[in-house]
Amino acid sequence: MNGNSKVHTEENKNEHQQEGKGGEQEQEQINKHINKDTINNNNNNNNSMSMEMDINSVSVNSLSEPTPNEQQNNNNNNNSNGNGNGNDETTSSKTTTIINSNPLDTDTIMHLNNNDSSNNTTTTTIPRQSSSSIQNGIHKEENINQLTEIQLQPSLQIMDKEQQMNGIEESTTIATQTTLPTNNNNNNNNNNNNNNNNNNNNNNILEKESNGVQEIEDSPNHLSLKRKLMILEEMGLISDDNNKNNNNNSIDIPNSNRLNQIPSSYKTSLYICLYPIGYAIDNIYKDKIFTYNDKISKDFLNSISQGKLTPYIINILDQLSEQNDQKQQQQQQQQQQQQQQQQQQQQQQQQQQQTNNIYQNSNEITYYNGCIVVNIKDYRGFAENEQIAKTFNSKNMKPYPITVPIGTFKEFIEKRIILKPTMESLLFDIKKNCSTLNNDNKNNNINNINNINNNNNNNNNNNNNNNNNININNNNNINNYLNIKESEIVNEEYLLNFEKCLLHAITPQLELSVNPNCFFDQLETKQKQLYNQSHSLFSYKRFKPSDFIGLKYPVVYNNNNNNNNNNNKSYNNISNNNNNNVSNRFIKTHSISNIQERQQVNNNDLSTISTQQSPPTLIQTSAKRSIITLNTQINTTNSCLPNDNFSLFKFLNSNPKWVNERKSMLQYHSNINQTQSFPFNYQFNNNNNNNNNIPVNNNNNNVITQPPFGNGINTFSIKPSIMTKIPIECEQLNGRLLQFFSTSNLTVLTFECKAKPTGYELLMYVSETTQVLNTLISLRNLKFTAPSTSTSSSSSSGGTTTTTTATGTTPTTPTPVPLTQQQLIQQLISFSLNKPILPLNQQSPLAEASYVLDTQLPQPTYLSFPIGNSKQAHFLINHMKSCIEHEGHYILSYDSSFPDTISSQAQEIRKKAEYIHNQQQLNQQQQLQYHLQQQKQQQQQQQQQQQQQNQQQQQQNQQQQQNQQNQQQNQQQNQQQNQQQQQQQNQQNQQNQQNQQQNQQQQQQQNQQQQQNQQTQQQQTQQQIQQNQQQPTQQIQQQNQQQIQQNQQQLQQQQLQQQQQQIQQQQIQLQQQQIQQKQLQQLQQQQQQQQQQQQQQQQQQQQQQQQQQQQQQQQQQQQQQQQQQQQLQQTRNLQPQQIQTQPLQQPPNQMAQSMISPQSTPSTSPSPQQQYQTTPVLQAGVQPQSQLTIKQPIQQPLQPLQQPQPQPQQQQQQQQQQPPQPQPQPQQFAQHLQQQQMQRPQAQLQPPQILQQLQQQQQQQQQQLQPPQILQQQYQTLQPQQLILQQQIHEKQNIHQQMLLQQQRNQTNLQLLQQQAQQIPPNNPQLLQTNQQQQQFVTQQIQHQHQQLLQSQSIIQQLQLQLHQQQQLQQLQAQLQQQTSPNIIQQQQQQQQQQQQQQRIN
């Protein structure tokens, strides 16, 4: 303790606790009032004032509560007032207190002395914090008349692993306290109450030390384990299930590893359907089709086929996310309205909800490490209806979107593709993110101003209630706002917002994770199993981390030792309470495993700190953190790893080693005299003291002293001294430039500090090259060389003047400007960031984004940060510099304040990057030259081709003229020929008509002749009947025989004429049926033989019947002779009457039917009247000899009729036309003959002759029995032949159908090849050649198949002819069997009767 008087500051806290429903967290809002305590001292020591704040260890929603003793002191202090002097640089009325919740670290007390020109000093007693917390204090520059309170938002803290295991929990609170100035009349009261306040504070400190560790659990500033778990849940790093299993105060946080999941579980973000006429995007434009011919659609599909996530697709996905948000809001409103409706509409609501859920699931967007899954369905060639297919395949469709009928396409080919981001998409993403952040910052600034005004009013009201002597006017409120704006402290809230914006801007949001090969390997294997490569619509490419960016220096990662998971990055929200409207792909959180592992290494390394003869370099300090190897051939397994990734919570974590490294880096990169290179709280003097040891570890109270740093200057063991004045270098921040290189994606960050009337502003430019810095330097030089066109404005904070040049705004007065400067200014002004995103129907945003490598101006992608006054700007710039350097992926390449102190590593990387850039430029120049040469050659070739084409066109024109003349001549000739042909055809038609008329006349004549013949026959028969009645019986028989012969001859002649006509008509058919004629001839001969046999059989039957009748007659005659002898006299007169009456008992039709054979044709059969007229011939007495003579001539004229027989088809037709005729009755005729024989004398019988005849008849019957057996054998052989032919025909028909299907497939393939040939650009002759070759091959296959089809048709026709012939033969045989079967039965019966007769005769 020094001899200076002590001043103890006190706190006054008003607690407001609100308990929410459902177990919500308690919210504490505390208004802090700090009174001013000053003591006038006579010491003239020149000391500097410094205030330190703890950023790395901050509690969440917990502030220090006052003890009862402190509350009494606060009540006493409410009536006191502080000294307030009106001088600017002599007095200061601000004090800050940092209250520590851990009583173990209260041994050391730091002294901050402030020596004003009026010898008035204010000191504050601040308990030392642990080594885990590093204090970053901020000095206020001016005397403040009135200050208000600033409410702090809660920050987050992640504990060390050792602290979590041992159960030791620490937290500190930062309280930026302000005081209100009062009148100078109350200064004495403050001086009187200082000693009492100091004593109370000392008593409180001693009480805490005596309680020890037990005070930790009961202290209100303590951050409990439950609260830590709640914070981790809000961050998304731990689930609710882990809260239940919290034994031994340990936290098990699972690492999110999405890449180890099954590829099928990944959700698709875009659904694309390919139709014959165009494509559709089902997520956004449902049932609408876009054409393939548009440039936008070509770029869109090409990017998908190449697997690239372009900025155009990002815009589409953003539109989709916006639509999803709107749909959710609409659905919520609809649900509220639907609940009020009746119960009858519940069914409709369920259906609507089902459909809405389907659309919601399909519209969700999910990013997997910056990648998207796209689902493609190809419906081309799978239309259900032919009409719909024709409409879609037609080329006369309208260009605007059309609606697709539902259910038209059912079959499709499906494929899933992954899109990865490119360099253009990364830059576009940063640009879009920066634009959203700028809009958010503007809104936040407005809200902060309103909050400050409200806080000022509340504080003023509280002070009026406590202090009756204070009266504040409205003018004082305005002065308060201005003073706060000028001297605003860089508090915790502002620092967090600054780091968030910096994190979003620096990190590439769409960069892939640690080991993406697992994801793509799994997906590739699944796609090979599920889908054939032949059906692939787009060329699938295997993605690698270095492919999509084209890096010369790929990022190499390593697996963690403690955790087996390969991936530690997860794209989740940092917290659900963020108001920034940023999508999931913009936010990237990190797992805690890296932080815990880093803390173990740091705690082990702190104990082995040794003396350093020279400052540590970047390579030495970052060797154990994250070195990104630049060698492209290093394997992923043996590479150095980033054990600590850049995170927002890194700055809040208690890690003293990182702070020490930052100090050493800052000291190494700056000279000792240039103190402005350090942050404000790290500026020290050369005063050496002995009691300046800082504890490093919280668990052990061992104090590690660090040796001095070069030239006897200590950095860690030096007591900080108070600074009376800020150096000029700190205030001259306008135009400061910083540049950083990226090692992961070769982006360049350039920062520029500009002065404005309200304060300083930091601009960040994102580009691909280093030329942005050169343009800014050239603009800065032009600003100084140009005439004075700027307006000067003095900053109210520190009295320094800042100038605003014409680079950002237009000049107020017209001044002559050189051409170079004017061009640069116009080009700078022309850039506009807030441009609208174009929809689908307009051009893509890539056309507007000017990502040109050779531009000499800053890119339009920038981000602005309001920094504040000179002190705040100086602090934040150095803070930003250290953050980016420690992040690992960016290295400092240029600093305008220290251009010569750049690290060796940065110089090497810069040289390599410049070398690569120069090589790229050379390659581009060579490519340009090569392209120019090719273009010249192409132009020359095109000119030659055009000349050749012109010549060919002239020749073609001449040929066309000749062809036209030839065509005209040919047309005339064709017309003449057609006329002649028509005339000939007319003549032929006339002749045909005449011939037809003649034929009809001939047929009529023939019919008339037939009628006349019939009439003549009837007349002749009538005449013959009359003559027969008069002539004797013998003459009548002869005449009858002659007439029968004549009739038969006439009938034969008529049949021959008809057959000749039929033969003439069938000559054309006989040529095709030569194979059948032989078989038909054989069958005809068989039929003739069968007919002859049948006639012989009939004759034998008649003879047998006659013999039987004769025997019966002999018996009767014997009986009659005996009777006659007895009655001769009585019966003499009656005998002639009996002889006449007995033959009349027979029917008259029997004799006529017996005279004609049963096989006679229907045309020759007489009518029943004619038959009845012929019966009187047999009424007279007939002798027995005439029976034999009658049957012999009947058989002779029937034989020539059997030779010319009509074909079976004609016979069937004639049989259908003929009416049914009565069959002959041979039995009745036989009975009639028997009665006649009974009347004859017995002397006329000759038994030997009868026996001979019977033997002949038996031989004939045996011969007639053979043909039916032969017919049965032939009938049985024909059936298996027909079955064999039918099987052969069936097999040939199946083969024929398969060949037709193959021909149709080849035709469809040819159509597809023709469509592809139309889509192929003319720049690819190789593809055209391959396509033409494929078309030729397909056409050859089609021709070959056509020939095979013709051959198979001919074979099938031949087989069908054979089968038809066999069927006809089978029908003929069936008919013959039907005719022969009844004859055979009769023959068998007759044979039995004959055998009986022979037995009787013998």
From Swiss-Prot:
Q: Where is this region: Disordered?
A: 1-29, 60-107, 114-133, 177-206, 786-817, 1136-1174, 1199-1250
**What InterPro entries does the annotation carry?**
Spt20-like_SEP
Specify residue ranges for compositional bias: Polar residues: 60-72
Specify residue ranges for compositional bias: Low complexity: 73-102, 183-204, 786-812, 1136-1150, 1157-1174, 1199-1218, 1226-1250
- One of the Pfam families matching this protein, by short name: Spt20_SEP
Q: Where is the composition biased (Basic and acidic residues)?
A: 7-29
Task: Provide the family line.
Answer: Belongs to the SPT20 family.
Q: What is this protein called?
A: Transcription factor SPT20 homolog
Q: Which organism is the protein's source?
A: Dictyostelium discoideum
